[in-house]
UniProtKB/Swiss-Prot annotation:
Belongs to the fungal hydrophobin family. This is Class I hydrophobin 20. It comes from the Eukaryota. Its main location: secreted.
Length: 143
């Protein structure tokens, strides 16, 4: 008959073997491919439940350029402000980045977001000037 310490040792080894056999082993060789699949699954889940990749009323956009909001950008947008009513308060107190040459990302396509957007994937406020300039953008990882 086994002594108490031997029983405990046997129990620990048996439990370790059981847990090791029950734990799935996942080997990821291509991390970028894994992250793309994870992002696509996340987006698909959000779309299926009626959500969006971007929260708080922001829109998923693909922008050709991202700029920090400074006086040069304000000068560029100054002419546009006269034609857009109600945006002056938002422009004078900006948060985030300004996205230039932006288009909304609505379809994933066969290859995922990286095929749809080869530039900068961002979440922008639902505030667009002249359909290509977005205010209050935050970069997202599209790979």
């Amino acid at each position: 008959m086994l002594s108490h310490p031997m029983k405990l040792l046997f129990f620990v080894f048996a439990l370790s073997a059981l847990l090791a056999a029950a734990t799935p082993v996942v080997e990821v060789r291509d991390y970028q491919q894994f992250s793309r699949v994870s992002l696509i699954n996340f987006i698909s889940f959000n779309k299926a439940r009626g959500g969006d990749l971007c929260a708080n009323g922001k829109k998923t956009m693909c922008c050709g350029e991202l700029k920090t909001f400074d006086k040069n950008i304000l000068g560029l947008l100054d002419g546009l402000l006269t034609t857009v009513v109600g945006l002056a308060g938002e422009i004078l107190k900006p948060t985030g980045l300004v996205g230039l040459e932006c288009v909304p990302i609505t379809l994933l396509g066969n290859g995922g977001l990286s095929d749809v957007c080869k530039a900068n994937g961002v979440c922008c406020k639902d505030l667009t000037l002249r359909a290509a300039i977005n205010v209050g953008c935050v970069p997202i990882n599209i790979l």
